[in-house]
Amino acid sequence: MNDRQAALDQALKQIEKQFGKGSIMKLGEHSDQNISTISSGSLALDIALGVGGYPRGRIIEVYGPESSGKTTVALHAIAEVQAQGGTAAFIDAEHALDPAYAKNLGVNIDELLLSQPDTGEQALEIAEALVRSGAVDMLVIDSVAALVPRAEIEGEMGDAHVGLQARLMSQALRKLSGAINKSKTIAIFINQIREKVGVMFGNPEITPGGRALKFYSTVRLEVRRAEQLKQGTDVMGNKTKIKVVKNKVAPPFRIAEVDIMYGEGISREGELVDMAAEVDVINKSGSWYSYKEERIGQGRENAKQYLKEHTDIRDEISQRVREEYEIDGANKEPLEETEETLSLLDDE
């Protein structure tokens, strides 16, 4: 062993002695090279994300115009976490969560942890406490724009508070990012959009809360309504495009198209018909859809209805589509507490 290697080994021992075992290691020795994920609750979005769902221990930003389906996307993820036996928390800074709608989407509202804080500082302190407990698998904050700093709440109408919210978010994310990674919590920040005044060229849209969230996010999703879904003259929902604007774990810029039905959320059958037809699991000939030589409906809506009524066939098609896209759940880890996550509070 040469002098350089001996010096390095001595330094590594000193670091581990001072900061604990596992504080530094060779990347090849890291036991968690595969990215562990939790399904988003949408097959199309799982495929667009490239790794089969939201990566655990990472920050996700979901933004878009008003009533585009941002909260719906987050609630589907919560339902998926709860279905796997995990714990989810919802920090409702907007004070606008509809429990009945959440229940329709599959959320177990009896088990969902809910907080409706008065100030941005309170919301982020609650978020930090939940993350550092190591017992929360998913945390949703709705929304960043509603995280109003205490100084603004206590001040007068019309007072200028330049950059307060951006500083608040920057400080909070510096504290949260490490704990989120260690605890394997998925932190979903819902955000709104604003428009810069006087922008003549380029996109005038920006998201509130400064630049910190853009940098700390592993995945950024842009949610926008594409068109209305009608039955006769009645509007039943919206076709929505979810664009993966940023992705640190897979190629970005993929787009998931989903049907968000009023009162029901994302239509599993709608996205399944589209994705299955794309990889020839379902055959589309003219207006007819067929599966294993058997016709399942004339027109997309009839095919959706057939799958809704025949859940065994729907699940079989879903599994085949996941295998075609190679997201059959190989990177799913059980949601359970670990010694590392439970010791987060002791590290402080």
Curated annotation (Swiss-Prot):
Cystine connections: none
Keyword annotations from UniProtKB, A to Z: ATP-binding, Cytoplasm, DNA damage, DNA recombination, DNA repair, DNA-binding, Nucleotide-binding, SOS response
UniProt-annotated stretches for the region Disordered: 325-348
Residues reported in the UniProt entry to bind ATP: G64, P65, E66, S67, S68, G69, K70, T71
GO molecular function: ATP binding; ATP hydrolysis activity; ATP-dependent DNA damage sensor activity; damaged DNA binding; single-stranded DNA binding
Location relative to the cell: Cytoplasm
GO CC term (a single one): cytosol
Keyword Membrane: no
Family to which the UniProt record says this protein belongs: Belongs to the RecA family.
Name of protein: Protein RecA
Native source species: Listeria welshimeri serovar 6b (strain ATCC 35897 / DSM 20650 / CCUG 15529 / CIP 8149 / NCTC 11857 / SLCC 5334 / V8)
Chain's gene name: recA
